[in-house]
């Protein structure tokens, strides 16, 4: 039996990679919510057995502060930081794969690995030098801005003490990123916004570059996969 895939595998792999990140986040976020709820129930159960008023006030204050710090600040921050890191890693990997595939497919004379600079700089130069369609200025700007956030997380654990003026202005003008105690606080919406954008960016790029994205297969009849 002959099976015909009506898509290029690089398109499928890219779509799947970003979908996996979204699934991971949904699972992890749900687990944090469950643990948070159980911890609050444990605190209330423990406090029910405290009869002395002063002791109750001391323990409740301590336990509720610890709960807030852990489940409203620490864990959400760790989750969104890991989310940003995973999105960036996938973005970098898939851009490398796209450029390498174009290099082989079109028998180009310039490879991405021969270029220097940031991820956005190298990709922009690669597309411009070879007069390729698919990625525009808005896409490059998005990659650049997201890279700065990722780098601040990786190299400074989100601390903004040594942040560049460009990064500070970017954070100041975004409504889903703030700072608290001079550390980045990233909302879930920021991560989902960029995950959605990069998925669409690749889809548009594949279309303009002539890749097949009809995610169906054919044998004796056409079936969705």
Residue ranges and their predicted role:
Residues 154-164:
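Substrate-binding/catalytic groove segments of enzymes
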Residues 1-85, 137-144, 148, 164-225:
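Extended intrinsically disordered or low-complexity regions, especially N/C-terminal cytosolic tails and loops
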Residues 90, 150-153:
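Conserved short aromatic-hydrophobic micro-motifs
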């Amino acid at each position: 039996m002959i099976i015909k895939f009506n898509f290029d595998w690089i398109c499928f792999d890219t779509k799947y990679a970003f979908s996996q990140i979204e699934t991971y986040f949904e699972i992890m976020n749900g687990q944090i919510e469950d643990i948070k709820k159980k911890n609050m129930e444990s605190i209330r159960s423990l406090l029910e057995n405290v009869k002395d008023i002063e002791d109750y006030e001391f323990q409740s204050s301590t336990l509720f502060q610890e709960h807030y710090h852990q489940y409203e600040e620490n864990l959400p921050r760790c989750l969104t930081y890991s989310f940003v890191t995973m999105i960036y890693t996938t973005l970098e990997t898939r851009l490398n794969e796209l450029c390498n595939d174009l290099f082989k497919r079109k028998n180009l004379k310039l490879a991405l690995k021969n270029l220097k600079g940031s991820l956005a700089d190298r990709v922009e130069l690669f597309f411009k030098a070879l007069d390729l369609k698919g990625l525009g200025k808005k896409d490059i700007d998005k990659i650049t801005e997201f890279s700065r956030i990722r780098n601040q997380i990786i190299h400074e654990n989100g601390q903004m003490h040594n942040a560049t003026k460009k990064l500070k202005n970017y954070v100041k003008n975004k409504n889903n990123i703030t700072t608290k105690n001079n550390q980045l606080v990233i909302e879930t919406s920021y991560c989902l916004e960029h995950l959605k954008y990069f998925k669409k960016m690749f889809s548009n790029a594949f279309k303009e570059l002539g890749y097949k994205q009809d995610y169906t297969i054919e044998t004796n009849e056409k079936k969705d996969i």
